[in-house]
């Protein structure tokens, strides 16, 4: 199959990478796993066994008129332990390489079908200036956009850093979540070739 390149000849690409069927279930599973892996999972509370303090009975069982009490670390006391204390947890989910690559291929194929994948010969800015990039994006009628280059261009990265809904990644930095988060995806010809090699 062929992808149209802005201002140049069409680029022949692999059908298996850019012409796959849309697999919503696979994409959902991979995106959920990706988001789960980003969770910190470090919350921690203390049970009554872990709270610092004496284990001595505060006052005798009977005769004081007060409610009976056996431990100042009781969960019903102020500063006591937590009944079902939260503990650090690993939320990560296992995703096979084949599934992960399949999800990215499926997303790229859907972007092509929806005309949301724009292939350009190259995408550069002369200086790390936001206004230079804004002008370039205006010329291409782009606002909400992910720009993927073969290698990370520092000028382009710095120019895009302060722009809302504009992100710059190299091929190694793409993931399913970023691919579906933007309205349009701009990819350079060299990046397309690298993506094909990476997902082969």
Curated annotation (Swiss-Prot):
Q: Where is this region: Disordered?
A: 43-71
Is the Ribosomal protein keyword given for this protein?
A: yes
Does the entry feature the keyword Secreted, yes or no?
no
The alphabetized UniProt keywords are: Ribonucleoprotein, Ribosomal protein, RNA-binding, rRNA-binding
Read off the Pfam families from this record: Ribosomal_L4
User: Biological process GO annotation list?
Assistant: translation
Q: Which NCBIfam families match?
A: rplD_bact
Q: Read off the InterPro entries from this record.
A: Ribosomal_uL4, Ribosomal_uL4-like, Ribosomal_uL4_dom_sf
Q: Which GO terms describe its cellular component?
A: ribonucleoprotein complex; ribosome
Fill in the subunit field for this protein.
Answer: Part of the 50S ribosomal subunit.
Q: Which gene encodes it?
A: rplD
Q: What does this protein do?
A: One of the primary rRNA binding proteins, this protein initially binds near the 5'-end of the 23S rRNA. It is important during the early stages of 50S assembly. It makes multiple contacts with different domains of the 23S rRNA in the assembled 50S subunit and ribosome.
Q: Give the matching PANTHER family.
A: 50S RIBOSOMAL PROTEIN L4, LARGE RIBOSOMAL SUBUNIT PROTEIN UL4M
Q: Please provide, alphabetically and separated by semicolons, the GO molecular function terms listed in this UniProt record.
A: rRNA binding; structural constituent of ribosome
Homology family? Belongs to the universal ribosomal protein uL4 family.
Q: What is this protein called?
A: Large ribosomal subunit protein uL4
